Regions:
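A short, small-residue-rich loop immediately preceding and capping a beta-strand
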Residues: 111-132, 144-147
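Glycine-rich, highly charged phosphate/nucleotide-binding loops
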Residues: 96-105
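Catalytic or ion-coupling anion/metal-binding cores of large enzyme and transporter domains
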Residues: 2-54, 59-78, 85-86, 91-96, ...
Length: 557
């Protein structure tokens, strides 16, 4: 086979001088004829750390079989994962966003070092998805992403968020120890990613809309023949990308990112999509900013009635056809650009033409002229509390404005203790700070406190502010990613208990009701609380990471 299809592997295996390389490869299963084939790296995030990833080894095998069937030589390798659901609410959660960078770095390292001509990545837990695609963008070799798939519902349509909210219900006394144990024991029935339009399903959908996975890859259950077939088809499809030299940056254009943003909004997806799409765009050399989310949000309605803000699970969306019919609706209404190329080698429009519409009697996805919300639930806020931006998730059910007195905590643990000891009341603005990319370090998610508030029945009566993140499972009046963060002396560091805070999702403003002079006086006397010297990867991350408004990345432009 020509060197054009073996642009990288030919340097590893061709010629007398590469006999040692070939000798090593023979030991891992290469035959003489395999050296003439394009080599395809298959990056598996298989792990028994989390149910999100416990089945991915089987999907990696299916992808390898597909790649074998079309004349390439697959090589499976592994990378790490961290479980958000397990580490949530603990110091371990500091490593979650850090793992995005470690995964991207490790995939880049193996592919660059081994000279693979193409790349298939498989991800399950939240940070896997952006990490895999960030690595693809950096390497810019023919690549496809395969989503590990969504989990089946638990008993009585429960999921992981049901368990987090049950903690608040238990604290409030509305459920017993036995009832809590029952929810804990039956909410997670097996493999797959968390079952609402939380971060994993949001990012899988965004990547499909971006063009980096096959149609409907985002909308299959983890344990299903459909997901095994999707993985096999990805293995088959990689050869077409190699043959035609279609690379990630050919696919991930500015217009493709705009498609991904629009689909995330239509699905009612996670705030984490903002952070992750900014990070992917950074690696793809695409100029994307918070203002693009605001601009696209003004013209894009929320159409899907999915958890956490809505009623339905991902498994129920899968039953009616996944996100492909949604994208058909959006294409017909000119809410996405159908001319963008995808990993099939065809345009989005050509891909969508092969699929039908939703059943007429379905109630999960609304019509464009009768949306759940006429514009985006993801609001980009600015003001004297967030001069460089913040990201709010406001479905409209909570109202569009909130004004209240601040209750300030300098860590998630302190805030959680305050909530469970009934120190938070209706009308409060709960501020959790020093949880940003540099402050935590690692920008922890605040699912434990928000779920506890929901469980106590205060979800529509309390607003949350943080320089950290919110889980895709969070709902309520929440504002995160506040920039500059407290660790860097941002205005959020200057808030005191009892300060009046105003949030307006109509004007996209977030303000502390103090004069510039008062803020300046507080800034003059501000001293950053002493943070532990963490050592290791957390210190490395703190020294490199950019702000949330820039995607919290660790590589230079």
């Amino acid at each position: 086979m020509s060197k054009d299809k073996r642009k990288y592997s030919s340097e590893i295996v061709d010629g007398v001088e590469q006999a040692p390389s070939r000798a090593m490869l023979r030991a891992v299963g290469f035959e003489s004829e395999d050296f003439a084939k394009p080599q395809v790296g298959i990056a598996s995030t298989w792990s028994m750390v989390t149910p999100c990833n416990m089945h991915i080894d089987k999907l990696a095998d299916a992808a390898a079989n597909g790649a074998n069937s079309v004349g390439s030589k697959p090589v499976i390798f592994n990378t790490i994962t961290v479980s958000d659901g397990i580490s949530m609410g603990t110091k371990g959660m500091r490593y979650s966003l850090v793992s995005r960078e470690v995964i991207a770095d490790s995939i880049e390292t193996v592919v660059g070092g081994q000279g693979f001509d193409g790349l298939i990545t498989l991800g399950g837990c939240d940070k896997n998805m952006p990490a895999c695609v960030m690595a693809m963008a950096r390497l810019n070799r023919p690549s496809i992403f395969v989503y590990g798939g969504s989990i089946k519902p638990g008993t009585n349509r429960t999921d992981i968020v049901s368990v987090f909210e049950a903690v608040g219900q238990h604290s409030e006394g509305s459920i017993s120890d036995i009832e809590l144990l029952d929810i804990e024991s039956t909410a997670i029935p097996g493999p797959g990613s968390c079952g609402g339009m939380y971060t994993a399903n949001t990012m899988a959908s965004a990547i499909e809309a971006l063009g980096m996975s096959l149609p409907n890859s985002s909308a299959q259950e983890a344990v299903s023949q459909a997901k095994l077939k999707d993985s096999h088809r990805a293995g088959e499809a990689i050869m077409n990308l190699i043959s035609n030299d279609i690379k990630p940056r050919d696919i991930m254009t500015k217009e493709a990112f705009e498609n991904a943003i629009a689909v995330v909004i239509a699905l009612g997806g996670s705030t984490n999509a903002v952070l992750h799409l900014l990070g992917i765009a950074h690696e793809a050399k695409v100029d994307l900013s918070l203002d693009d989310f605001e601009r696209i949000g003004k013209r894009t309605p929320v159409l899907a009635d999915l958890r956490p803000s809505g009623n339905f699970l991902m498994s129920e969306l899968i039953e009616i056809g996944g996100i492909v019919p949604l994208m058909k609706i959006m294409l017909e209404k000119e809410l996405i650009d159908g001319n963008q190329i995808t990993v099939t080698g065809k345009t989005i429009e050509a891909n969508l033409n092969e699929y039908g519409h939703y059943p007429e009697d379905q109630t999960i996805v609304t019509k464009v002229d009768k949306p759940i919300k006429a514009d985006s639930h993801l609001r980009i806020l600015y003001g004297n509390l967030a001069p460089k931006g913040a990201v709010a998730k406001i479905s409209g059910k909570e109202g569009l404005k909130f004004q209240g007195m601040a209750k300030v905590y300098n860590s998630e643990e302190d805030a959680m203790a305050g909530i469970l000891s009934n120190k938070i009341s209706a009308g409060d603005v709960l501020v959790i700070r020093y949880e940003g990319p540099r402050g935590a370090p690692g920008m922890r998610e605040m699912l434990s406190p928000t779920s506890a508030i929901m469980g106590k029945g205060l979800g529509d009566k309390v607003a949350f502010l943080t320089d950290g993140r919110f889980s895709g499972g969070t709902h309520g009046f929440v504002v995160g990613h506040i920039t500059p963060e407290a660790f860097d002396g941002g205005p959020i560091a200057l808030i005191q208990d009892g300060d009046l805070i105003s949030i307006d999702a109509e004007t996209n403003q977030i303000n502390l009701n103090l004069s510039e002079d008062d803020l300046a006086r507080r800034k003059d006397s501000w001293v950053c609380p002493v943070k532990d010297e963490e050592g290791g990867v957390l210190d490395k991350y703190r020294s490199l990471v950019t702000s949330a408004s820039e995607g919290a990345v660790t590589t230079k432009k």
